């Protein structure tokens, strides 16, 4: 089974390194510097020291990716619509399975990644690939656990077999909505946890905040489904609790580090400056706005997410933010 990966950031490249050890992989990038770097050094600047197999061919033209039987989308969520439209314009075949490896909620529409794909490529089957997985550890082929969510059991089982590696424990789920909600929210909570840690409020407050975060995940998850039901296996599995713990406790997390810099700044922080200092997208920044608006649309209270939103977008003080986070 040929596999294309769209997005040559740290995460997309890590997946390419993992799968490329045994499969032919096409890795698409829009960045000519990245293209030349990988082709010249067989290494990405985002993952120094991690060799990219010769089985991975790098392409600049998206039309060179459409003949694979599986397409993995590892682009930022706010760029997903544009990439899907490009695939549509290239006449992507209807039987090509699309695996979403991006996390977030589109700001302009409040749609999940699967809803964006369904809108533009309605005939292509969709799966979600999510869980606790730092790109650098995946690229180094350290052990990790993920969830492959798909509403088609036959396709899901086939994709699990294709993505399974010796160092990966891959669990199957039908819960594509729950898995995506958890994946998006954890980045906002990681920013909140970073603020608490950066403000030196201690691990007790940090642990309490993670615990309260689970309640907000459950609230949005339940409201988004509409019937109040949630899958406890999703909440307590790798895609939710596992990813939340990892993202909210390690400074390898871009979102936690972002929040830490804010909390450690004594109110003298500049959000745009901190964002510009990083080499990668801080998904939680965009997601905070999306979650704030989605919670309003669904008429639910999410005080942690609201506090992070008001700090990032409405210049709320760190003191006012912390009073909510530790209340």
Curated annotation (Swiss-Prot):
Enzyme Commission numbers on file: 1.1.1.94
Binding residue positions for sn-glycerol 3-phosphate: 103, 131, 133, 186, 243, 253-255
InterPro entries, A to Z: 6-PGluconate_DH-like_C_sf, 6PGD_dom2, G3P_DH_NAD-dep, G3P_DH_NAD-dep_C, G3P_DH_NAD-dep_N, NAD(P)-bd_dom_sf
GO-annotated cellular components: cytosol
MF term (GO), any: NAD binding
Pfam families given in the database record: NAD_Gly3P_dh_C, NAD_Gly3P_dh_N
A biological process term (GO) from this entry: glycerol-3-phosphate catabolic process
Binding site for NADPH: 11, 30, 103, 135, 254, 281, 283
Residues the record marks as active site: 186 (proton acceptor)
Keywords, sorted A to Z: Cytoplasm, Lipid biosynthesis, Lipid metabolism, NAD, NADP, Nucleotide-binding, Oxidoreductase, Phospholipid biosynthesis, Phospholipid metabolism
Catalyzed chemical reaction(s): sn-glycerol 3-phosphate + NAD(+) = dihydroxyacetone phosphate + NADH + H(+); sn-glycerol 3-phosphate + NADP(+) = dihydroxyacetone phosphate + NADPH + H(+)
Pathway where it operates: Membrane lipid metabolism; glycerophospholipid metabolism
Disulfide bonds: none
EC primary class: oxidoreductase
Function of the protein: Catalyzes the reduction of the glycolytic intermediate dihydroxyacetone phosphate (DHAP) to sn-glycerol 3-phosphate (G3P), the key precursor for phospholipid synthesis.
Family according to the record: Belongs to the NAD-dependent glycerol-3-phosphate dehydrogenase family.
Protein name: Glycerol-3-phosphate dehydrogenase [NAD(P)+]
Organism: Wolbachia sp. subsp. Drosophila simulans (strain wRi)
Gene (UniProt): gpsA
């Amino acid at each position: 089974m040929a596999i294309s990966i769209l997005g040559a950031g740290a995460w997309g490249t890590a997946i390419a390194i993992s799968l490329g050890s045994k499969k032919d992989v096409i890795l698409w990038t829009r960045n000519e510097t990245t293209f030349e770097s990988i082709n010249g050094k067989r290494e990405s600047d985002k993952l120094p020291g991690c060799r990219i197999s010769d089985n991975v061919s790098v392409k600049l033209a998206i039309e060179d990716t459409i003949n694979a039987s599986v397409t993995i989308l590892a682009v930022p969520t706010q760029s997903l619509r544009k990439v899907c439209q490009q695939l549509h314009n290239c006449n992507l075949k209807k039987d090509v399975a699309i695996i979403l490896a991006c996390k977030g909620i589109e700001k302009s529409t409040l749609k999940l990644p699967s809803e964006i794909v369904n809108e533009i490529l309605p005939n292509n089957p969709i799966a979600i690939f999510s869980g606790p997985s730092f790109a650098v550890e995946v690229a180094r082929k350290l052990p990790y656990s993920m969830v492959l969510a798909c509403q088609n059991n036959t396709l899901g089982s086939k994709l699990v077999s294709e993505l399974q590696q010796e160092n990966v424990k891959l669990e199957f789920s039908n819960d594509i909505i729950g898995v995506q909600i958890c994946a998006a929210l954890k980045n906002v909570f990681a920013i909140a946890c970073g603020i608490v840690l950066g403000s030196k409020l201690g691990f007790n407050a940090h642990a309490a905040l993670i615990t309260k975060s689970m309640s907000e995940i459950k609230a949005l998850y339940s409201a988004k489904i509409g019937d109040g039901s949630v899958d406890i296996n999703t909440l307590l599995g790798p895609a939710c609790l596992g990813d939340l713990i990892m993202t909210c406790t390690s400074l390898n997390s871009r979102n936690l580090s972002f929040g830490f810099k804010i909390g450690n700044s004594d109110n003298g922080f500049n959000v745009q400056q901190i964002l510009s200092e990083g080499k990668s997208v801080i998904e939680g920044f965009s997601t905070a706005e999306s979650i704030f608006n989605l919670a309003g649309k669904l008429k639910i209270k999410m005080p942690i997410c609201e506090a992070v939103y008001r700090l990032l977008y409405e210049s709320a003080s760190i003191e006012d933010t912390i009073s909510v986070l530790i209340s």
